[in-house]
Amino acid sequence: MPNWKKVAVSGSNVNFNQITSSGDMLFQDSILSYQTNTDIDTGTEVVATIDGSAYKAAFFDYVAVSASVNIRAGSIMVAHDGTNTTQAEASTQDLGNTAGIKFSSSIDGSNNFRLSAAVSSNNWSVKTVVRGI
Protein backbone atom coordinates (compact mmCIF):
# COMPACT_ATOMS: atom_id res chain seq x y z
CA MET A 1 0.00 0.00 0.00
CA PRO A 2 1.51 3.39 -0.95
CA ASN A 3 2.19 5.90 1.81
CA TRP A 4 1.08 9.24 0.33
CA LYS A 5 2.34 12.54 1.66
CA LYS A 6 0.63 15.90 1.26
CA VAL A 7 2.73 18.93 0.45
CA ALA A 8 1.56 22.37 1.55
CA VAL A 9 2.30 25.00 -1.07
CA SER A 10 2.06 28.71 -0.26
CA GLY A 11 -1.34 30.02 -1.31
CA SER A 12 -2.94 26.57 -1.41
CA ASN A 13 -5.55 25.06 0.88
CA VAL A 14 -4.42 21.80 2.47
CA ASN A 15 -6.53 19.70 4.84
CA PHE A 16 -4.50 17.55 7.23
CA ASN A 17 -6.33 14.90 9.24
CA GLN A 18 -3.59 14.71 11.86
CA ILE A 19 -0.26 16.39 12.54
CA THR A 20 2.22 14.58 14.78
CA SER A 21 5.12 16.41 16.38
CA SER A 22 7.84 15.15 18.70
CA GLY A 23 8.74 18.68 19.79
CA ASP A 24 7.36 22.18 20.10
CA MET A 25 5.28 23.74 17.33
CA LEU A 26 6.03 27.34 16.36
CA PHE A 27 3.45 29.62 14.75
CA GLN A 28 5.02 32.95 13.80
CA ASP A 29 5.68 34.59 17.20
CA SER A 30 3.90 31.96 19.31
CA ILE A 31 4.67 28.44 20.54
CA LEU A 32 2.70 25.33 21.44
CA SER A 33 4.53 22.93 23.77
CA TYR A 34 3.58 19.71 25.60
CA GLN A 35 5.33 19.35 28.96
CA THR A 36 4.76 17.04 31.88
CA ASN A 37 5.98 16.18 35.36
CA THR A 38 4.55 12.78 36.22
CA ASP A 39 6.17 12.31 39.64
CA ILE A 40 5.71 15.38 41.82
CA ASP A 41 6.48 14.60 45.44
CA THR A 42 5.88 16.58 48.64
CA GLY A 43 7.20 20.11 48.17
CA THR A 44 7.43 22.29 45.05
CA GLU A 45 8.55 21.15 41.59
CA VAL A 46 8.64 22.78 38.16
CA VAL A 47 5.94 21.51 35.81
CA ALA A 48 6.63 23.54 32.66
CA THR A 49 9.12 26.15 31.42
CA ILE A 50 8.96 28.60 28.53
CA ASP A 51 11.42 31.24 27.28
CA GLY A 52 10.45 34.49 28.98
CA SER A 53 12.56 36.59 26.64
CA ALA A 54 10.50 35.38 23.66
CA TYR A 55 7.01 35.32 25.23
CA LYS A 56 5.31 37.79 27.61
CA ALA A 57 2.30 35.57 28.32
CA ALA A 58 1.59 31.87 28.57
CA PHE A 59 -1.51 29.75 28.92
CA PHE A 60 -0.89 26.49 30.76
CA ASP A 61 -3.75 24.07 30.01
CA TYR A 62 -3.36 21.23 32.51
CA VAL A 63 -4.68 18.08 34.09
CA ALA A 64 -3.54 17.29 37.64
CA VAL A 65 -3.98 13.73 38.95
CA SER A 66 -3.22 12.01 42.27
CA ALA A 67 -3.93 8.35 43.02
CA SER A 68 -5.99 8.10 39.80
CA VAL A 69 -9.10 9.37 41.62
CA ASN A 70 -8.22 12.98 42.48
CA ILE A 71 -8.42 14.91 39.20
CA ARG A 72 -8.70 18.55 38.14
CA ALA A 73 -8.36 20.16 34.71
CA GLY A 74 -7.88 23.84 34.07
CA SER A 75 -6.03 26.69 32.48
CA ILE A 76 -3.58 29.03 34.18
CA MET A 77 -3.02 32.36 32.43
CA VAL A 78 0.29 34.03 33.27
CA ALA A 79 1.91 37.29 32.15
CA HIS A 80 5.29 38.71 33.15
CA ASP A 81 7.31 41.91 32.92
CA GLY A 82 10.75 40.28 33.17
CA THR A 83 10.78 40.42 36.98
CA ASN A 84 7.26 39.72 38.24
CA THR A 85 4.48 37.39 37.16
CA THR A 86 0.73 37.65 37.54
CA GLN A 87 -1.62 34.72 37.12
CA ALA A 88 -5.25 33.69 37.09
CA GLU A 89 -6.70 30.19 37.04
CA ALA A 90 -9.94 28.71 35.76
CA SER A 91 -10.56 25.05 36.51
CA THR A 92 -13.11 22.28 36.73
CA GLN A 93 -14.57 21.18 40.02
CA ASP A 94 -12.60 18.39 41.65
CA LEU A 95 -13.17 14.74 41.01
CA GLY A 96 -12.11 13.47 44.41
CA ASN A 97 -10.00 16.06 46.25
CA THR A 98 -7.26 18.17 44.65
CA ALA A 99 -6.84 20.60 47.55
CA GLY A 100 -3.32 19.17 47.96
CA ILE A 101 -1.92 20.90 44.85
CA LYS A 102 -1.32 24.62 44.31
CA PHE A 103 0.22 26.27 41.25
CA SER A 104 2.58 29.25 41.14
CA SER A 105 4.56 31.07 38.45
CA SER A 106 7.96 32.74 38.45
CA ILE A 107 10.83 34.08 36.33
CA ASP A 108 14.24 32.53 36.99
CA GLY A 109 17.69 34.10 36.57
CA SER A 110 17.90 32.96 32.93
CA ASN A 111 14.58 34.68 32.11
CA ASN A 112 12.76 31.36 31.91
CA PHE A 113 9.07 31.59 32.69
CA ARG A 114 8.08 28.68 34.99
CA LEU A 115 4.91 27.03 36.24
CA SER A 116 5.47 25.11 39.49
CA ALA A 117 3.26 22.83 41.56
CA ALA A 118 3.40 22.63 45.35
CA VAL A 119 1.92 19.39 46.67
CA SER A 120 1.21 18.12 50.17
CA SER A 121 1.60 14.42 49.33
CA ASN A 122 3.66 12.27 46.94
CA ASN A 123 2.92 10.99 43.45
CA TRP A 124 1.05 13.81 41.74
CA SER A 125 1.12 14.00 37.95
CA VAL A 126 0.62 17.19 35.93
CA LYS A 127 0.43 17.24 32.14
CA THR A 128 0.36 20.58 30.33
CA VAL A 129 -0.04 22.06 26.90
CA VAL A 130 1.65 25.45 26.99
CA ARG A 131 0.72 28.23 24.59
CA GLY A 132 3.24 31.08 24.63
CA ILE A 133 2.55 34.43 22.98
Give the residues covered by each predicted segment.
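Broad, structure-driven detector of short, well-ordered beta-strand segments within folded domains
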Residues: 7, 17, 72-80, 103-107
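Trimeric beta-solenoid/beta-helix "fiber body" segments of extracellular/virion adhesins
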Residues: 21, 29-30, 66-68, 80-82, ...
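Residue-level recognition of well-ordered beta-strand positions that form the cores
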Residues: 26, 61-63, 77, 116-118, ...
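Terminal beta-strand-rich extracellular "head" domains
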Residues: 77-100
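Low-complexity intrinsically disordered segments
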Residues: 93-133
